[in-house]
Amino acid sequence: MANATTYRTCPRSGLQFEDQAEKLMKANAFVAVVWLLIGGLLAIGVVLTRWPALRWLEADTFYMVLTAHGINMLIFWIIFFEVAVLYFASSTLLRCRLATPRLAWLAFALMVIGSVVNNIAVFRGSS
């Protein structure tokens, strides 16, 4: 039983995007930007606390926010965006289909669940 693979040709670049890979690229890039936004908002808390005239957060809250900021900006944003780029490079530039799209979606779901659980642990103070 052969699976029919559908491709979309970009009108600007002429690149061919495989359907499942394109959806995974968009999903990973979107979640990456969400983590970047959350990390940027946490950076405001870090900066306002480091400003000597303001001292916005208490010490324990400051380090919790600093930890969440670092994890979101240095790990989650980079990893999700890197996966989006890898799907682009492996499927679009090499013109290949995804071998196991269901497994790829499972991996994406596990990445999202893991990153959310990690943030919950940090904000509960139990990390």
Enumerate the predicted regions with their spans:
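Hydrophobic cores of alpha-helical transmembrane segments in multi-pass integral membrane proteins
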Residues: 2-11, 26-53, 60-96, 101-127
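N-terminal juxtamembrane segment and adjoining first transmembrane helix
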Residues: 13-27
